[in-house]
Amino acid sequence: MRCPFCGSDNTSVKDSRAAEDDTAVRRRRVCESCGARFTTFERVQLREIIVVKRDGKRSLFDREKLQRSILIALRKRPVDRDRIDQMVSGIVRKLESGGETEVPSSEVGELVMEALKRVDPVGYVRYASVYRDFKDPSDFAQFIEKAALEDEDDDADGK
């Protein structure tokens, strides 16, 4: 593994442990050249997934981009990092197990919305405001009202 600080190939693993509900291995590494310490993660990749954007452009699915978007929605919210990692792993597993090599960005967005709705209602609304492109405060009000009605329906159905 190349050191991200000095570029040397002379690194060694100091500690390894399971992470993200045993779906990844977290490795603590040290560069023998500059002494820098850094962490890497190793995960199984079932297949490469291509995300098809609204404009038709295609790009390789980026787990880190998914995680960043969730972190932004949950900024300053009482959700610990392990819970966020579990959420990201769950979304990735759903995408990989779907069997499709190409997935519309709308499907990724809906999976994120479902996960955030279960974890943090404020993060859910924050993400929705960007994903659904809210233009003014009335868009927030309509979305929150609709979400509240769906919650009532779920409660009535015993979900």
From Swiss-Prot:
Cofactor note: Binds 1 zinc ion.
Domain of life: Bacteria
Listed Pfam families: ATP-cone (PF03477), Zn_ribbon_NrdR (PF22811)
Obligatory cofactor(s): Zn(2+)
Record-level Gene Ontology MF annotations: ATP binding; DNA binding; zinc ion binding
Zinc finger (unnamed): 3-34
Matching InterPro entries: ATP-cone_dom (IPR005144), NrdR-like_N (IPR055173), RNR_NrdR-like (IPR003796)
UniProt KW keywords: ATP-binding, DNA-binding, Metal-binding, Nucleotide-binding, Repressor, Transcription, Transcription regulation, Zinc, Zinc-finger
GO terms for biological process, alphabetical: negative regulation of DNA-templated transcription
Domain ATP-cone: 49-139
Matching HAMAP family: NrdR
Function: Negatively regulates transcription of bacterial ribonucleotide reductase nrd genes and operons by binding to NrdR-boxes.
Family, similarity comment: Belongs to the NrdR family.
Protein name: Transcriptional repressor NrdR
Organism of provenance: Hyphomonas neptunium (strain ATCC 15444)
Biological classification of the source: Bacteria, Pseudomonadati, Pseudomonadota, Alphaproteobacteria, Hyphomonadales
